[in-house]
Regions:
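Terminal alpha-helical segments
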Residues: 1-133
Length: 133
């Protein structure tokens, strides 16, 4: 995991924790989770799998494919995309403070799980131990 990737994920998470509006917390937490996915994909995805037939592939599906032990996390965060898209479209009241806080907490747990599993070395050979989180 590169320091830049990790720094970007942590920065998004810090932004989520400091944001006043629930919609801003939700968006920043979702971005933090996507940045964590980027870290895993950088280490696990075979070259050329980020794009399929010229179109980008869904990050959550790719995560489940390259790190099956993270499939539940992938499904969870994929399910949050509808609200994220609605917020981006202007429906800022669609998420409650509780939902935003929960997503921040979950994004933080996801980041810590990946940090512990990957550390600063590649993990192509080693699955991520989700039982230890």
């Amino acid at each position: 995991m590169s320091n830049d990737d990790l720094r970007r994920a942590r920065s998004s998470l810090a932004e989520a924790e400091l944001a006043q509006r629930p919609s801003d917390r939700y968006l920043a937490a979702h971005l933090a989770a996507l940045r964590v996915v980027a870290i895993v994909l950088t280490h696990r995805a075979p070259p050329g799998t980020v794009r399929l037939e010229g179109r980008p592939r869904n990050a959550w599906r790719m995560l489940a494919d390259v790190a099956p032990e993270l499939a539940e996390w992938a499904a969870f965060f994929a399910a949050t995309e509808g609200k994220r898209d609605a917020i981006r479209g202007g429906a800022t009241s669609i998420v409650s403070a509780r939902e935003a806080d929960d997503l921040v907490r979950d994004a933080k747990a996801f980041l810590h799980l990946v940090e512990r599993a990957i550390g600063f070395s590649a993990v192509r050979e080693r699955p991520i131990d989700v039982a230890s989180s």
